[in-house]
A protein has these predicted regions:
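Catalytic-site signature of metal-activated, phosphate-bearing donor transferases
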Residues: 1-62
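Structural marker of alpha-solenoid helical repeat scaffolds
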Residues: 36, 70-74, 109
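Short coil/turn linking the two alpha-helices of tandem helical-hairpin repeats
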Residues: 55, 72-75, 94
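Inward-facing hydrophobic residues that define packing positions of alpha-helical scaffold repeats
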Residues: 64-65, 103
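Charged, long alpha-helical assembly modules
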Residues: 94-112
Length: 112
């Protein structure tokens, strides 16, 4: 079930895990991949997203903040996605003001 919905005329963004696919192997494989290749910013991003999908809010926030600090994490759309995932994790932890701040950062990162 989707969480809170924000509307802006002409804009819609939905990103939810595909419930038709088994995700049982994603997390252990991503954790292994990041241990083996800690400088692979793409897999760090995916690991943080997977923590979000699993409701592991603190792991999500920590991992995605690390992703944003990586010198190779330059793709602005992916950086903005990490910020949105951090925002959603903050929201789910009851930190609405922090969530708002992260959403605003995401908009600034990739305003298109």
């Amino acid at each position: 079930m989707p969480g809170p919905i924000v509307t802006a005329e002409g804009v819609q963004l939905d990103h939810h895990p595909d419930q038709a696919k088994s995700r049982s192997q994603y997390l252990p494989l991503l954790e292994l991949s990041v241990r083996e290749e800690p400088n692979d910013d793409r897999n760090v991003h995916y690991l943080g997203r997977e923590y979000l999908y699993r409701g592991r809010w603190d792991d999500c926030i920590r991992t995605l903040k690390h992703h944003l600090s990586m010198p190779t994490a330059l793709w602005r759309d992916e950086r903005a996605a990490s910020m949105r995932y951090i925002a959603k994790a903050c929201w789910n932890k009851g930190s609405g003001a922090q969530a708002r701040d992260w959403y605003l950062r995401a908009i600034t990162e990739a305003p298109h």
